[in-house]
């Protein structure tokens, strides 16, 4: 099982400071700009964590509000020291890098920061003397600058910002730079001249960059240990250059905090475009022969000719082996030792028996699929989404044997690619199967909370129907409301947002209403009142109104009334909202339109029982039409006794206000009383109930009074039924809430009916016997 170890003190303090910046580390200058308090000095370990955690909070926690001038806290290296920071996506703009230009950064990772322009290229020069590692992966606009040359007024009126490619920037002066990632950049960047000043590159990533002549790579043949050419359109000329990079044969190099293993990645996305180049037996043999000490190789996505593999009949028998001499891939038999990693995703080779590598990415089994998700998540969402889709099939059809690893990898992918439709669809679908009851015992509270967070992030960031449906279904795998309480307000807001469009997808509507109903069941009144103010009552009434117009009584209709029943329980404000927004008209219309829908009737009457418990609202129920409807429902046999019981409960509270409050001529009060007595006497005292009382307070207030004996009798019958049928639940509740002395007083009352007193004695007897049977007599 996953560990439920608490967060470190460092993590807790970092989180608190970031959520309370102007109350902890800084203050607001001119009510806008953050400034560090003058008496604070923060070392690099703390500064790096603050920045990196800030990025994580902004990208992963939608409830966290970013601060426009956050990076200004780190503008002065005399009080703050930054060394290694990882920034991503639209969070970072030119002015943010400009704010920290005086820092001696050693490591700067900028991933998919599309708001960065050529202004940031100039800022990068500020770090040239200290930078060892730089990633500009996916920063597609950083080599563009605005240009409004004279004589193009007409063009600039249409497009005031004319963008031109920067061609004169180079890495001149970046003398310490060893690691560089320029992957996923736009076409046209003059890579050769850009990189020429770098003398000692150890790792280079040119993913997606097309260059017909790769000869310039040989300038680092004595230093380059890791080369990534993912999605580069290769040719035999490229291969001839690659095999000259003899340092790719080297073993692990230590450079500062980094360990670089010799790695070659010539993989591709097989769906992105047509590639003429095919990996032949000759090419693979050449790579192994010339780069025999490679520790890691990725050839995923390539069309590989069949003569590369050993035939099934010639394969070594016995257990799968990583020994090169037994390799099912013929050219790899020349390896001196097994590879640490071999990327074979979406190639035929991954399905072979003997693969000379300790870790393989592929699509053959769960292990290979998880390795693929792990290897490609950060920079290759197109591959990651397909790998997660394979994991989805494994979790759905078979059994996931590495559950915790799978969950963590999917969570990471969803956080990393919050706005990628394919990953959000496949990831949310995989989470549904990975969190179901079969796997529940293996998951810690912390891990399940991480799942909830990432699901809510998906719902918040992506309005696509499939994502919304998958996320709602995944939430159904959790104990509601208990496991969602730490995000209670947020999840309700999201669900109500889903339900607001009345033409919403039917399946999502049904799931969302079910979740809303579960969320307001068994929670305290403060929660219910807060959700009511968020528009819960109004949203449910609109759904009901829409179903009425369609003349449809389905699960959405029934769940909506059930949700209203739950949210109005002991919450007068929500009851009043129900009345104010035409709830009684909808009740009458539903009753008329769907006379045979028993569960619907029960839910509606349960809700009206809650309304009737509020003294200030009861006058609104005192109309001839409403009283007649309630009286007629006393004789209903729908859903056992439930509809009749709830109708009698509504009338009992109305009767409790006395004859002077009876403001209608028809039906007469005495007539209704007689019908109530008859209904109560017709009920089976041993009836099993479809009801759940959290408190007896509304019932108990009907006991110590003589103004309405029938109300008193209904309350006593309710208690007798519940303590008889469900003694373990309701005897302790009645004793706890002081019901016993009230029942004893009732027995002494002259106005109480004899049958009511007799029933009260039986309730007292049941509870007394229960207390004696459950008394702890151990010593």
From Swiss-Prot:
Signal peptide bounds: none
Classification via InterPro entries: ARM-like, ARM-type_fold, Armadillo, LRR_dom_sf, LRR_Zer-1, ZER1-like_C, Zyg-11_UBL_adapter
Q: Which residues carry this modification: N-acetylalanine?
A: 2
Asked if the Swiss-Prot or TrEMBL record annotates the protein with the keyword Acetylation, the reply is: yes
Alphabetized, the UniProt keywords read:
Acetylation, Leucine-rich repeat, Repeat, Ubl conjugation pathway
- Pinpoint the residue ranges of every LRR repeat in the record: 226-245, 246-281, 291-315
| GO process terms (BP) | positive regulation of proteasomal ubiquitin-dependent protein catabolic process; protein quality control for misfolded or incompletely synthesized proteins
Keyword Acetylation listed? yes
Task: Write out the ranges of the repeats annotated as ARM.
Answer: 440-480, 524-569, 571-613, 615-656, 727-769
GO CC, sorted alphabetically, is: Cul2-RING ubiquitin ligase complex
| Pfam families per the UniProt record, alphabetical | LRR_Zer-1, ZER1-like_2nd
Instruction: Tell me the protein family, please.
Output: Belongs to the zyg-11 family.
Q: What does this protein do?
A: Serves as substrate adapter subunit in the E3 ubiquitin ligase complex ZYG11B-CUL2-Elongin BC. Acts redudantly with ZYG11B to target substrates bearing N-terminal glycine degrons for proteasomal degradation. Involved in the clearance of proteolytic fragments generated by caspase cleavage during apoptosis since N-terminal glycine degrons are strongly enriched at caspase cleavage sites. Also important in the quality control of protein N-myristoylation in which N-terminal glycine degrons are conditionally exposed after a failure of N-myristoylation.
Q: How does it assemble?
A: Interacts with the ELOC-ELOB/Elongin BC complex. Part of an E3 ubiquitin ligase complex including ZER1, CUL2 and Elongin BC.
Protein's name in the database: Protein zer-1 homolog
Organism, scientific name: Mus musculus
Q: What is the lineage of its organism?
A: Eukaryota, Metazoa, Chordata, Craniata, Vertebrata
């Amino acid at each position: 099982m996953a560990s439920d170890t608490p967060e470190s003190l460092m993590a807790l303090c970092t989180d608190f400071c970031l959520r309370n910046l102007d109350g902890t580390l800084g203050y607001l200058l001119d009510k806008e700009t953050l400034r560090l308090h003058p008496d604070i000095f923060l070392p690099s370990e703390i500064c790096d964590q603050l920045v990196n955690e800030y990025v994580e909070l902004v990208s992963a926690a939608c409830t966290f509000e970013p601060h426009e001038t956050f990076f200004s806290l780190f503008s002065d290296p005399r009080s703050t020291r930054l060394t290694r920071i990882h920034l991503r996506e639209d969070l970072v703009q030119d002015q943010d890098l400009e704010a920290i230009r005086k820092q001696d950064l050693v490591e700067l990772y900028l991933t998919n920061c599309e708001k960065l322009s050529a202004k940031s290229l100039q800022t990068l020069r500020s770090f040239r003397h200290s930078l060892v590692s730089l990633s500009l992966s996916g920063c597609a606009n950083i080599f563009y600058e605005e240009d409004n040359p004279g004589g193009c007024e007409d063009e600039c009126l249409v497009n005031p910002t004319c963008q031109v490619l920067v061609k004169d920037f180079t890495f001149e002066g970046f003398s310490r730079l060893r690691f560089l990632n320029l992957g996923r950049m736009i076409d046209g960047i003059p890579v050769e001249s850009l990189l020429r000043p770098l003398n000692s590159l150890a790792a280079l990533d040119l993913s997606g960059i097309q260059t017909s002549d790769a000869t310039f790579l040989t300038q680092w043949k004595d230093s380059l240990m890791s080369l990534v050419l993912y999605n580069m359109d290769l040719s035999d000329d490229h291969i001839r250059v690659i095999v000259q990079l003899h340092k790719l044969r080297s073993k692990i190099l230590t450079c500062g905090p980094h360990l670089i293993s010799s790695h070659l990645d010539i993989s591709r996305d097989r769906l992105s475009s047509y590639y003429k180049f095919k990996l032949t037996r000759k090419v693979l043999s050449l790579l192994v022969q010339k780069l025999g000490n490679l520790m890691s190789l990725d050839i995923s996505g390539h069309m590989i000719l069949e003569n590369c593999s050993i035939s099934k009949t010639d394969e070594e028998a016995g257990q799968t082996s990583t020994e090169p001499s037994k390799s099912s891939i013929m050219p790899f038999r020349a390896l001196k030792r097994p590879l640490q990693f071999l990327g074979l995703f979406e190639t035929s080779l991954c399905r072979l028996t003997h693969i000379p590598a300790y870790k393989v990415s592929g699509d053959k089994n769960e292990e290979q699929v998880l390795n693929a998700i792990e290897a490609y998540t950060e920079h290759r969402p197109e591959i990651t989404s397909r790998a997660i889709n394979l994991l989805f099939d494994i979790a759905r059809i078979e059994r996931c044997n590495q559950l915790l690893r799978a969950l963590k990898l999917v969570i990471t992918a969803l956080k990393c690619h919050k706005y990628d439709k394919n990953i959000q669809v496949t990831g949310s679908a995989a989470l549904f199967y990975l969190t179901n009851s079969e796997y529940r015992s293996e998951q810690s509270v912390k891990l399940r909370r991480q799942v909830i967070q990432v699901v809510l992030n998906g719902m918040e960031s992506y309005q696509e129907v499939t994502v919304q449906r998958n996320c709602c279904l995944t939430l159904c795998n959790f104990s509601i409301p208990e496991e969602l309480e730490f995000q209670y307000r947020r999840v309700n807001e999201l669900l109500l947002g889903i339900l607001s469009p009345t033409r919403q997808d039917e399946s999502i509507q049904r799931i969302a209403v079910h979740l809303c109903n579960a969320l307001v069941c068994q929670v305290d009144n403060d929660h219910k009142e807060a959700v009511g103010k968020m528009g819960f009552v109004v949203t449910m009434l609109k759904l009901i109104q829409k179903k009425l117009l369609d003349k449809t009584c389905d699960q959405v209709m029934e769940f909506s009334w059930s949700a209203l029943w739950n949210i109005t329980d002991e919450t007068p404000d929500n009851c009043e909202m129900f009345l104010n927004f035409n709830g009684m008209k909808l009740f009458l219309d539903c009753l008329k339109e769907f006379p045979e829908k028993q569960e619907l009737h029960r839910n509606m009457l349960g809700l009206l029982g809650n309304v009737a418990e509020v003294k200030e609202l009861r006058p609104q129920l005192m109309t001839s039409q409403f009283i007649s409807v309630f009286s007629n429902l006393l004789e209903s046999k729908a859903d056992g006794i439930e509809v009749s019981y709830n109708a009698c409960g509504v009338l009992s509270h109305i009767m409790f206000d006395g004859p002077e409050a009876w403001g209608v001529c028809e039906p007469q009060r005495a007539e209704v009383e007689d019908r109530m007595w008859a209904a109560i006497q017709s009920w089976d005292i041993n009836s099993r109930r479809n009801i759940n009382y959290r408190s007896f307070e509304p019932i108990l207030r009907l006991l110590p009074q003589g103004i309405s004996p029938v109300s008193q009798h209904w309350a006593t019958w309710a208690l007798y039924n519940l303590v008889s049928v469900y003694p373990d639940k309701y005897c302790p509740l009645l004793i706890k809430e002081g019901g016993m002395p009230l029942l004893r007083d009732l027995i002494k009352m002259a106005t109480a009916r004899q049958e009511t007193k007799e029933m009260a004695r039986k309730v007292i007897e049941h509870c007394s016997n229960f207390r004696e049977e459950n008394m702890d007599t151990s010593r």
